[in-house]
């Protein structure tokens, strides 16, 4: 149901997630030992609570499926390019691309790290799909300008930017997860606005974000900064969804964390849905749906 809270801990959600993983999704491939920032998994005494590469954040494929189903319009038969096109300025791993391809969408993801792009392309080659996945290596601030002709226009944007320096993905100076807070905010807003310039009018934009803490322990208000970056372009906030995460190891960490510094255990992310146009123009002729006949492995789980 299209409610404002999604609980990812339910059996139904986890089955759907397992179904996608059964296709062979390995979004963590391509990330080396620097691909997560261990400080977030330490308490104030310096004791490591969880510190393995498997803890690098992986985008939820079930969330991809849901957002593509809810917010990607049906193909326009009058257009030369009939498959809907998804733009992702902060691609990271392979999940958003491969789920898009499996659902008959064409995906364009911008990713700074060459090794991650190569791993993603191999994943797509192994798994395939009805749609086409294209990962563009390089700094999104540049590749979003250099890659496309003026005729290119995406039907949907789905992205998940770095949460400040919560996870550090590389030591590349162009990697915004390496930047100081002020520089990060400016670079992030710049990339978002360059991506929004490639959106069709009257389309949706979904950004999965969460507030993170600065070096002093204060929340950085990343949600509000994301809203501001989009609304400057004229892309207005239309829906907000709270994505409730699985408790997992948080149950073990939160008591000690709260006792030490009164920090609440974070159990959710924010899925911000923007509309790039006039809501009055929305059509009621349906939205994109996945052909499960072409996804037998997944269909067994659903």
List the predicted regions and their residue ranges.
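Class I S-adenosyl-L-methionine-dependent methyltransferase catalytic core
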Residues: 1-302
């Amino acid at each position: 149901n299209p409610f404002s809270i999604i609980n990812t801990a339910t059996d139904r959600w986890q089955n759907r997630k397992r179904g996608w993983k059964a296709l062979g999704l390995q979004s963590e491939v391509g990330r080396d030992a620097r691909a997560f920032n261990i400080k977030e998994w330490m308490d104030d005494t310096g004791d490591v609570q969880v510190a393995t590469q498997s803890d690098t954040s992986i985008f939820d494929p079930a969330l991809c499926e849901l957002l593509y189903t809810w917010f990607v319009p049906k193909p326009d038969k009058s257009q030369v390019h009939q498959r809907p096109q998804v733009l992702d300025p902060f691609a990271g791993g392979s999940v958003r691309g491969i789920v898009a391809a499996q659902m008959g969408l064409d995906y364009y993801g911008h990713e700074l790290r060459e090794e991650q792009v190569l791993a993603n392309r191999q994943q797509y080659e192994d798994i395939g799909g009805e749609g086409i996945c294209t990962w563009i290596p390089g700094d999104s601030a540049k590749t979003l300008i250099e890659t496309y002709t003026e005729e290119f226009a995406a039907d949907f944007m789905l992205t998940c930017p770095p949460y400040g320096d919560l996870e550090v993905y590389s030591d590349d100076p162009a990697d915004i997860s390496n930047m100081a807070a002020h520089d990060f905010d400016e670079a992030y807003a710049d990339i978002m606005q360059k991506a929004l310039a490639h959106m069709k009018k009257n389309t949706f934009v979904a950004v999965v974000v969460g507030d993170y803490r600065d070096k002093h322990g204060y929340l950085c208000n990343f949600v509000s900064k994301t809203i501001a970056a989009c609304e400057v372009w004229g892309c207005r906030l239309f829906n907000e969804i709270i994505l409730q995460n699985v408790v997992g190891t948080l149950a073990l960490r939160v008591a000690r964390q709260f006792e030490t510094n009164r920090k609440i255990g974070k159990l959710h992310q924010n899925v911000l849905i923007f509309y790039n146009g006039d809501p009055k123009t929305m059509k009621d002729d349906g939205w994109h749906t996945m052909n499960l006949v072409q996804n037998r492995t997944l269909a067994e789980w659903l």
